[in-house]
From Swiss-Prot:
Organism phylogeny: Archaea, Methanobacteriati, Methanobacteriota, Archaeoglobi, Archaeoglobales
Keywords: Ammonia transport, Cell membrane, Membrane, Transmembrane, Transmembrane helix, Transport
Topology of this chain in the membrane: Multi-pass membrane protein
Protein's recorded name: Ammonium transporter Amt2
Site keyed Twin-His motif. Important for optimum substrate conductance: positions: H201, H356
Membrane-spanning ranges: 1-21, 39-59, 77-97, 123-143, 156-176, 194-214, 236-256, 268-288, 297-317, 321-341, 350-370, 400-420
Subcellular location: Cell membrane
GO biological process terms, semicolon-separated: ammonium homeostasis
Superkingdom of the source species: Archaea
GO molecular function: ammonium channel activity
Length: 468
């Protein structure tokens, strides 16, 4: 009965919605004949970002064991599908709708009414693929042990509420970017994040931290004395290919955030993106080579992604040399951050917490340090953005505040969500299911039907009781 009532209400809302501002684009084109070029640019870049889902899927699959690969792929597929519907119905309105008290948007539900407009829906699509990125980050950290149903609920909540509300604070005219206090302290502008080091990556990374804490480590990850054991992924080639896909897609992520093909700064944005990734990869490779005597493939991949994450916020406002410094520090964060977490009993399968969480925070702070005053809030228009190295200590403090708020919101809401799910339905599969593998346990399928399983972990599962 309740379900039928909800459907009826939804139909009524859609039927009574007023016509969009410009659903066929005629008026928009009349006002600005050059706008189609910008539309094509933004959409193509959005397509690149959407394809990053494949990169995340490949990277996570490569770092996971063969018995869990179908589950990994299914999670990455469905967080985009579920997230698309959630962001369509609720998320976009909360993020980009008419501002209410600097907290959230209040218009644009179901892309109906005035939101049924070519310009608005272009923005919806671009923000959607960012929402999908934020959601899928968590998948890798918690791989090989969560219930698939729990992951679906999580994907819907992140795309509908957690990402949109924080996104509104930065990108929708909310309090972090636009309040009088923040703007005055920053010297004419509040908190900034060009393409999402904080809004997307740190958000996903700190939700992952909360989830990993509540899930517990995989069976066999730690010995009886609490020392970590290596659990190798089944295919490093997948991980490297996934890294290449992410690196390529990131040009759409960062350069596409201009939302305009007429913005010539895209050359610097793209170059900064590449340099930071390269510096992160080389740094992580060097650290593992010196530490272990051989360069680690997985850590090198993570170093590249960490560099990409860190440059995402400052990419439009810093010089190329700064991007190398930012990427180098991100390489240190990715490696030492992973080892630091591992020693504390936090089993992050792909290293997403240091790569996206810690490096995302570093990206927000780096913007407050290295912004050089050559680029403004709106292209070359004043005010031009400067950081600590160029005399604007106030903006540096603004970015520190933004980083603290980002952690508090992401970790707090993520912990609350997974804690509630743990109490209500449970968030982890049984020990027997974990040892069998989530491909069979959750989907009655296997990714490699012709492979012979050589793992004999069921006795260990029974002994350790699921690590909970």
């Amino acid at each position: 009965m309740v379900g039928r009532m909800c459907v009826a209400v939804l139909i009524v809302l859609l039927l009574v919605a007023t016509a969009g501002a410009d659903p066929n684009g005629a008026e928009t084109l009349k006002e600005n004949p050059e706008l189609p070029v910008d539309f094509v640019w933004a959409l193509i870049c959005g397509f690149l970002v959407m394809f990053m889902q494949a990169g995340f899927a490949m990277l996570e699959a490569g770092f996971s064991r063969a018995k869990n690969v179908a589950n990994v792929m299914m999670k990455n597929l469905m967080d985009f599908a579920v997230g698309s519907l959630a962001f369509f119905a609720v998320g976009f309105a909360l993020m980009m709708g008419a501002d209410w008290q600097g907290i959230a948007g209040t218009t644009g539900w179901f892309l109906a009414g005035e939101s049924y407009d070519v310009s608005t829906i272009e923005l919806w699509f671009f923000m959607l693929v960012f929402a999908a990125t934020a959601a899928t980050i968590v998948s890798g950290s918690i791989a090989e042990r969560p219930k698939f149903s729990v992951y679906l609920v999580y994907s819907a909540v992140v795309s509908a509420v957690i990402y949109p509300i924080y996104g509104h604070w930065l990108w929708g005219g909310g309090w972090l970017s636009s309040s009088e206090f923040m703007v005055k302290l920053g010297g004419g502008y509040g908190a900034l994040d060009f393409a999402g080091s904080g809004v997307v990556h740190a958000l996903g990374g700190y939700i992952a931290l909360a989830a990993v804490m509540l899930l517990g480590p995989r069976l066999g990850k730690y010995d009886s004395d609490g020392n970590p054991r290596a659990i190798p992924g089944h295919n490093l080639a997948f991980a490297v290919i996934g890294t290449f896909i992410l690196w390529f897609g990131w040009f759409g992520f960062n350069a596409g955030s201009t939302l305009s093909a007429h913005e010539l700064r895209v050359s610097i944005i793209a170059s900064n993106t590449n340099l930071a990734a390269a510096a992160g990869a080389v740094t992580a490779m060097a650290i593992t080579w010196l530490r272990n005597g051989k360069p680690d493939v997985g850590m090198t991949c993570n170093g590249a992604v960490a560099g990409l994450v860190a440059i995402t916020a400052p990419c439009a406002w810093v010089q190329p040399w700064s991007s190398v410094v930012i990427g180098t520090i991100a390489g240190f964060i990715a490696t030492y951050g992973y080892w630091w977490l591992e020693k504390r009993g936090l089993d992050d399968v792909v290293g997403a917490i240091p790569v996206h969480g810690f490096s995302g925070t570093w990206g927000l702070i780096a913007l407050g340090i290295f912004a050089d005053g050559s680029y403004g809030l709106y292209a070359t228009e004043s005010p031009l953005v400067t950081g600590l190295l160029y005399g604007n200590w106030g903006f540096f403090i603004v970015q520190l505040i933004s980083a603290i708020v980002n952690f508090a919101w992401a970790f707090g809401t993520g912990f609350a969500l997974f804690w509630i799910l743990k109490k209500v339905i449970g968030i982890r599969v049984s020990p027997e299911e974990e040892m069998l593998g989530l491909d069979i346990a959750e989907h009655a399928a296997v990714a490699y039907p012709n492979f012979v399983c050589t793992e004999t972990e069921l006795p260990l599962a029974m002994k350790q009781g699921g690590g909970r």
